[in-house]
């Protein structure tokens, strides 16, 4: 039978970490170095950090402590900036400090597509047991470099600007156009 989830899922997610002790935690949606907005497109709580501690903050501003020391892999596959360690008090370090994260990946720039995050999910989760987390990251990295070399060869020769984005828009190869990329 179908069940209805609470409008604010912050407490349920905090309890998942604290009580159920998952070995893998996957998130997506809007994030910064200081928070993860659970709902993104709808009203919900958030995960935040302070003094190296990760905590949930629900829509009533109730702070929910996260203490989940069991080792886990964290995949913020669709979260901008979750991997950017710009100072001591940031989400990546709080996940490691109070949520037991031993391995994670994370974007250091804003992203909307996230080939590396979603690709690692495919190799690591969608093909269970075939790759370790590190192997999934490496395999996906090779796939990304191959895709760039095949579809946008000029891209690999361009230096990045301060934003991490290429200075010039690279031309698409004939293979890219045949694949429907525009």
Task: Give residue spans per PLM region.
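Short, exposed beta-strand "edge-strand" segments with a Pro/Gly-rich flavor and a Y/T-containing core
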Residues: 6-7, 61, 127-130
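Active-site-proximal C-terminal subdomain of hydrolase catalytic domains
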Residues: 77-182
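Catalytic cores of nucleophile-dependent amide-cleaving enzymes
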Residues: 24-120
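Functional beta-strand-loop-alpha-helix junction segments that form "active/interaction loops"
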Residues: 1-27, 32-34
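Surface-exposed intrinsically disordered loops and tails
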Residues: 2-5, 39-62, 157-180
